């Protein structure tokens, strides 16, 4: 009995080393291919959901915010848009959905949507005079005004074009050319007036039948006025139609007309090309700076995805329709609960055989807990932890870099004749967004599964590293722990952790202790067998006496 008791006490006080992993108070949850809402020690949100609700400078360059003016009102020079007569370089253009100051004289702007698309590749215009207003000596250049375009309570007209009227009851045929001697392309605008009736035609232009011819090396245009009775818009029954072209360097534009001509006075020299956009937004300027702008506000984020608005300008995350994208960077967070029986202390283990993580180990993801006569403590395995951190960091950065390539996310505009094309374009863009969203969500699910498996594998590798060193000098307890068959002081424990454990040095002591424990087990088994036989014989004898007594009594 004394030998058995000593053996049990010896077992309780045996030195131990355990392999485990970090745990903390995190409540972060991620989804994987196999599971939802897995709690992890560390996670990284890769979906930006916030913006500042302002229009900002883009990389230090201010946007051109047209306020109540449209692009057409700005380019033609609506009198109510005088603040935009000369504008500095812009990063992007902001136009309201329904600006009040558009074409003050009712009409149409030909290929307007195409012009807006052109502006999405331009960052700066320089306005230059190409045909001075004072050069029209045979025509009335100052009488072409309208109450539809008021300025300071008086009739006015677009600032950048001239509405030519007959002079002294005559409208001589115009033949005027302009040669682009600049090194830059020129944006030139002109127009035609469509009167309400024949009386207005002769009143303004004298000639009942008129035309306008415009030609460049790439353009051959002939226009005739469309005289028709129309309902009034802005008090006008007439209409104006405006046109534009890009005149290349060393090319010339030629105008010929005998009436109804709205001549260019100013043109726009395209002095800087680059990525720009025309963004529809009602926001105000916020005196801020950003790398990514949306119609809802600026995004300042290094995340690879956002769900704020599909239209963006700048270095932006990719838009997806998801509400949540979280990457696991740490381990499954399963803190081990303290047990009632504390003979072994807090020991944990990995998926499959380790019961929980250690909150006491704070300086690494994987590591050890040891206990011996000198005490106990946690120690992180710095090498495996650092390799894991590098691997996860590289993976996250790789995902961000891979997903940073974005298709053009600036909306296109279509005229009324192109609605079917617009609908098709929207369906295609919606399809792209659906694909990107699916890819992003699938990528996150797969990477989270791989990350958690990666951590499990690292802990298992650390366990195997210890197991292969100790061999039969220690016993595997099945919960991530090893119980030594020999005394293992702190120096011995450190050698196990750093991989320099000397198996032969401790093998003899371990063998003797192992044999002693085996002997105690055998002796205990023999004692229990004797007691069992004795108990059986005694019980049988008592039963026989009782049966005999009963027989005599019955006789």
UniProtKB/Swiss-Prot annotation:
Quaternary organization: Homotrimer of disulfide-linked HA1-HA2.
Protein family per UniProt: Belongs to the influenza viruses hemagglutinin family.
Membrane topology of the entry: Single-pass type I membrane protein
UniProt-listed GO biological process terms: clathrin-dependent endocytosis of virus by host cell; fusion of virus membrane with host endosome membrane; fusion of virus membrane with host plasma membrane; virion attachment to host cell
Function according to Swiss-Prot or TrEMBL: Binds to sialic acid-containing receptors on the cell surface, bringing about the attachment of the virus particle to the cell. This attachment induces virion internalization either through clathrin-dependent endocytosis or through clathrin- and caveolin-independent pathway. Plays a major role in the determination of host range restriction and virulence. Class I viral fusion protein. Responsible for penetration of the virus into the cell cytoplasm by mediating the fusion of the membrane of the endocytosed virus particle with the endosomal membrane.
Gene (name only): HA
Residue ranges that the UniProt entry lists as topological domain Extracellular: 15-529
InterPro entries for this protein: Capsid_hemagglutn, Hemagglutn_HA1_a/b_dom_sf, Hemagglutn_influenz_A, Hemagglutn_influenz_A/B
Pfam families (alphabetical): Hemagglutinin
Lipidation (S-palmitoyl cysteine): 555
PTM text: Palmitoylated.
A GO term from the CC aspect: virion membrane
Keyword terms, alphabetized: Clathrin- and caveolin-independent endocytosis of virus by host, Clathrin-mediated endocytosis of virus by host, Disulfide bond, Fusion of virus membrane with host endosomal membrane, Fusion of virus membrane with host membrane, Glycoprotein, Hemagglutinin, Host cell membrane, Host membrane, Host-virus interaction, Lipoprotein, Membrane, Palmitate, Signal, Transmembrane, Transmembrane helix, Viral attachment to host cell, Viral envelope protein, Viral penetration into host cytoplasm, Virion, Virus endocytosis by host, Virus entry into host cell
Protein name as catalogued: Hemagglutinin
Disulfide bond sites: 18-481, 56-288, 69-81, 104-149, 292-316, 488-492
Site positions (Cleavage): 344-345
MF (Gene Ontology): host cell surface receptor binding
Source organism of this protein record: Influenza A virus (strain A/Guinea fowl/Hong Kong/38/2002 H5N1 genotype X0)
Record-annotated membrane-spanning stretches: 530-550
Residues glycosylated per entry: 24-25, 37, 179, 300, 498
Subcellular localization(s) per the UniProt record: Virion membrane; Host apical cell membrane
Segments on the Cytoplasmic face: 551-555
Coiled coil: none
Keyword Transcription regulation: no
Keyword Thylakoid: no
């Amino acid at each position: 009995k004394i030998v058995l008791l000593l053996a049990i006490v010896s077992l309780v006080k045996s030195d131990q080393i355990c392999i485990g992993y970090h745990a903390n108070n995190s409540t972060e949850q991620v989804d994987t291919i196999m599971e939802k809402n897995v709690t992890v020690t560390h996670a990284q949100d890769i979906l930006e959901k916030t913006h500042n609700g302002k229009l900002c400078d883009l990389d230090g360059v201010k946007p051109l915010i047209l306020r109540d003016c449209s692009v057409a009102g700005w380019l033609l020079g609506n009198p109510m848009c005088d603040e935009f007569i000369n504008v500095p370089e812009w990063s992007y253009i902001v136009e309201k959905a329904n600006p009040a100051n558009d074409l003050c004289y009712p009409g149409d702007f030909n290929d307007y949507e195409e012009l807006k698309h052109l502006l999405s590749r331009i960052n700066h215009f320089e306005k230059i005079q190409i045909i001075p207003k004072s050069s029209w000596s045979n025509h009335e250049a100052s009488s072409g005004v309208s109450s539809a375009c008021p300025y300071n309570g008086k009739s006015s007209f677009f600032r950048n074009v001239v509405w030519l009227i007959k002079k002294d009851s005559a409208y001589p045929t115009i033949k005027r050319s302009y040669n682009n001697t600049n090194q830059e392309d020129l944006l030139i605008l002109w127009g035609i007036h469509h009167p309400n009736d024949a009386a207005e035609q002769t009143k303004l232009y004298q000639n009942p039948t008129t035309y306008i011819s415009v030609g460049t090396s790439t353009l051959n245009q002939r226009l005739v006025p469309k005289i028709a009775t129309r309902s009034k818009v802005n008090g006008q029954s007439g209409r104006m139609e405006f046109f534009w072209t890009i005149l290349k360097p060393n090319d010339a534009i030629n105008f010929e007309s005998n009436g109804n001509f709205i001549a260019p006075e100013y043109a726009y020299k395209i002095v800087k090309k680059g990525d720009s956009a025309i963004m529809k937004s009602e926001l105000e300027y916020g005196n801020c700076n950003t790398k990514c702008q949306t119609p809802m506000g600026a995004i300042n984020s290094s995340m690879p995805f956002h769900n704020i608005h599909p239209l963006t300008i700048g270095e932006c995350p990719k838009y997806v329709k998801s509400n949540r994208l979280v990457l696991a960077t740490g381990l499954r967070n399963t803190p081990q609960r303290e047990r009632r029986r504390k003979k072994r202390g807090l020991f944990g283990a990995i998926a499959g055989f380790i019961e929980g993580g250690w909150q006491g180990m704070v300086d690494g993801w994987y590591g050890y807990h040891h206990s011996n006569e000198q005490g106990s403590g946690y120690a992180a395995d710095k090498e495996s932890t650092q390799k894991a951190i590098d691997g996860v960091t590289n993976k996250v950065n790789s995902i961000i870099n891979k997903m940073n390539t974005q298709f053009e996310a600036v909306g296109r505009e279509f005229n009324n004749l192109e609605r079917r094309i617009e609908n098709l374009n929207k369906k295609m863009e919606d399809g792209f967004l659906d694909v990107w969203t699916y890819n992003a969500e699938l990528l996150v699910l797969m990477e989270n599964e791989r990350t958690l498996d990666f951590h499990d594998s690292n802990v298992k590798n650390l366990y195997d590293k210890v197991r292969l060193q100790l061999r039969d000098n220690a016993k595997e307890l099945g919960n991530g722990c090893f119980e030594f068959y020999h005394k293992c002081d702190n120096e011995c424990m450190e050698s196990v952790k750093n991989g320099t454990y000397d198996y032969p040095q401790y093998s003899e002591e371990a063998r003797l202790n192992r044999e002693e424990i085996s002997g105690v087990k055998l002796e205990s088994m023999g004692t229990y067998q004797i007691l069992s036989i004795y108990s059986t014989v005694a019980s049988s004898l008592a039963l026989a006496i009782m049966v005999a007594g009963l027989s005599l009594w019955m006789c």
